[in-house]
C-alpha cells in the first residue's frame, strides 16, 4: 500500500525517473498558514551534496496543487508535487538483466511481472522520501505547542566522533564500500496517552513509518525522563 495513517493520512505516488513525485495529505485542519518557503529548510537538509550522499542533484521545488488558497490550508487534501529533472535513465539499461545487490530490482520485477519501471529503482527509490520530508514540514505546522525535536547523526561506520565522519566516508569510498550509521532523534513535549493499545501504539506506528525509508534497517525506541 502507498497510503499510511488515520488522522494524518499520507498517499505517495511517482517513480524515481518519472515526471513527478507527489504526496497527498488528508486530515490537515483548515486555516493553517503554508507556503513553498516553509519547505526550504527541511528540503535543503535532505538535498544531496555532502560526502557520502547521492550524486543526483534535484532542485526539489514544491508545487502545491490543491488544498491551499490565499496562503491557508482549505481542509481539503493537500497535494504537493516535485519534478524529477536530474535523471540518467541510460545508466539503468541493464538493470532488468543484472539486478543490483541490496536493491528491489529483482523483487519488483517478479512482484509486478516485469511491468515495473526499473529506472533509478522506480517506485522503490529513496527519491520518494522527498515526499516524506514534505509531509514532515506540514505535520510540524499542526503539532501541539511545546513539542520539540532535536536530531543528530550519532554514528557513522562505528565512529561516534563527528570530526571523524568524513574520514570514515573517504575510506569507504576508496574501498568502493558502504557503511551504516545511527541517527538519533529526541522529541520533547509528547502528549500523554498518545497512540492506541497494541497494533496502533505510538511505537508501532513510528516504527512502521520509519521502516518505509529504504535505508532504515533498525529502530530503537526508548523513554527518557527529564
Locate predicted features.
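Short beta-strand elements
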Residues: 9-14, 21-27, 78-80, 108, ...
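Glycine-rich, N-terminal phosphate-binding loop and its surrounding beta-alpha-beta segment
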Residues: 42-101, 105-107
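Conserved small/polar residues in nucleotide/adenosyl-binding loops
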Residues: 224-226
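Conserved phosphate/anionic-ligand binding catalytic regions in large, soluble enzymes, centered on
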Residues: 8-28, 127-136, 199, 211, ...
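Solvent-exposed alpha-helices and their adjacent loops that cap or buttress functional pockets
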Residues: 1-5, 14-17, 56, 70-74, ...
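N-terminal, positively charged regions that mediate nucleic acid binding
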Residues: 1-57
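Glycine-rich, mobile lid/loop segments that gate access to catalytic sites or pores
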Residues: 111-198, 202
